[in-house]
């Protein structure tokens, strides 16, 4: 293929200087390509010649790689190049065609000359090259003269795309006071032009706005600080405009820009400062502990955690600053001054403290800027209030003997007015704490006396509340809690711990221990109890039993002689005198009940003469009550069951009376089936019957007359009734025999195993047949009104048949 100049354009085409330069470069490339032979891989005609044989003239393609400039704006199609076959002699017998990307739409070929033109405006940024295939055919026969050859049309780039920043918006940050040259961030632009062709995609960066504070690397786009004194407190945000220019920044290059937001972050370079050097507050002397006196806040120009601070109180000498403490509000960073001791206007009216604020986090890099703390003076004035009287002490313990007479002095309480006026005080007892008014108080002196008799055993302690109020202002009221302990006196005699009962065998030995006795005393002497046991003075000795004081507040009872006879005496009563140690000494008498019982050889009690002893020994009163309750519950359950059963029986009997007129007849006669077949000999079904032998047969073999149906008298039910005599079984046998003979003689009778349905239910029923066929007949003149008299259960049936009959007769009337 012989190349044609690709720059052959019409003279009237108007081109820009840049386009003319590019076309000139393209023309020089084509001239150089024409002087160089095409590679063997791009000459398919050689392969075809080898296939046709050695006697044929060698032919092949002559062609070049084509180029076309993008963004062509001319009005005529742009000449791309020419394809040509060596066999083309210029007589028009060869037809050139192309196929592939853009063939027939973007690229058109002259079939006679092989000239290719571009008809559309191309954009290299959308598609860089097009791959097509060329064919040369005989115009007359459409025979392929050369093998199909592939070629490429490349779109040549021009600088028509400006740089773009694709990853915006850009936001960076840098700490304040950072040194010069500190890297902030990097921005990068992209250019859609061909980076391998010319300088259309070579970019350089520059700062359009903000160059006083920041710089940018021309090649990498890294933004750095230009000054070392960036101060967030002066300016927190900077808007820097960065520009990217292609053609390596040369004249005529295209450019694009973006805005970069740079935020200056805070560092702790500012100490806290109090807006004023003295603060004054006032608080009432009655303020409780924990009351907030006031709030003070030190200002800090920093932000975030750099403003976190703590506060401390430092007391001035003798100023009473220990009455307050300071806490820090973590949300507002305020100092809260709080009362931590009770204030007293009369003792100190003004408190002065030094409040100090300091940062929590101090950056050592800025230690040379000074101390990161500040101080202020805080003065707190205590204001006077009318306070209620004060008890001294506010609570106390009093003691009184339980045998004290009414009006006896228990103790004295004292209260005074803490105010400077020192008004007189009046006293009273809060009756909610002394509902029974056991104690009284003198309103002027505060002396507490007994108002009623005391009993330690009933109430050993009393807690009362005493009120103190100003004489002329009862609203100023204070309270004091008093605990009064009742001291014990020996006013209760000792008693046996329980009503003792003992048992002794008839064959007991002398000196055998029967019972150990202990006592109780409601009193509580300071030195402890000491009890003494002896027999009553009326019977200082007992011939049967002896009493031994063990001297540990218990006593033991022993037998005096050998054996007892319960036939003569089965119960002995032994009175025992118990005396306490006083003072004064008190005593009481208790009785030990001793029962004589029969024992076995091992000494185990077998029986005693009284069941009371057994009950007392084995069952407590609570157990007896529980036993009685159980018995009562069982009796109630039995009565309830009997009542329910009687009620159930009465209900059943009423149902029986109501259904006395209901008669239900059920017929379950269903002959045939497999059971009947198994019960009979099947050979009998195949045997022939001699009708002549049954009745009216001709012994000569004449035709037998058909069997006659039984008369109506034979179908009547047999008479029955209570006065009927004992039936004759021969009558039944004759009746059954006749029925069997008739059935055997009837040719229409089905086999034994056939299913038979008998709708006839016998004569004598007032309602006649209840067959569905018969009862549904409209011709029946049966009157079913009598069904209503049979009770509630037959009323729906009577209404059904009565209504049906009425519907049938309605048209006739």
Swiss-Prot record:
- Could you tell me which residue ranges are on the Cytoplasmic side of the membrane? 643-813
The keyword Metal-binding appears for this protein: yes
Cellular compartments annotated = Cell membrane
Domain Cadherin: from-to ranges: 61-165, 166-274, 275-391, 392-495, 496-613
The UniProt entry's GO biological process terms, in alphabetical order, are: adherens junction organization; calcium-dependent cell-cell adhesion via plasma membrane cell adhesion molecules; cell migration; cell morphogenesis; cell-cell adhesion mediated by cadherin; cell-cell junction assembly; homophilic cell adhesion via plasma membrane adhesion molecules
Which top-level group of life is the source organism from? Eukaryota
Region span, Disordered: 696-726
Task: Report the glycosylation sites.
Answer: 159, 463, 609
Instruction: State the tissue distribution.
Output: Strongly expressed in the pituitary gland and the brain (in the inner granular and glomerular layers of the olfactory bulb, anterior olfactory nucleus, primary olfactory cortex, Purkinje cell layer of cerebellum, and pineal gland). Low expression in lung and heart. No expression in submandibular gland, thymus, liver, spleen, adrenal, and kidney.
Q: Identify the keywords attached in UniProt to this record, alphabetized.
A: Calcium, Cell adhesion, Cell membrane, Glycoprotein, Membrane, Metal-binding, Repeat, Signal, Transmembrane, Transmembrane helix
- What is a single molecular function from GO for this protein? cadherin binding
Q: Which of the residues are on side Extracellular? A: 34-621
Q: Which residues form the signal peptide?
A: 1-33
Which PANTHER family did the record assign? CADHERIN-22 (PTHR24027:SF311), CADHERIN-23 (PTHR24027)
Purpose: Cadherins are calcium-dependent cell adhesion proteins. They preferentially interact with themselves in a homophilic manner in connecting cells; cadherins may thus contribute to the sorting of heterogeneous cell types. PB-cadherins may have a role in the morphological organization of pituitary gland and brain tissues.
Give the protein name, as stated in the record.
Answer: Cadherin-22
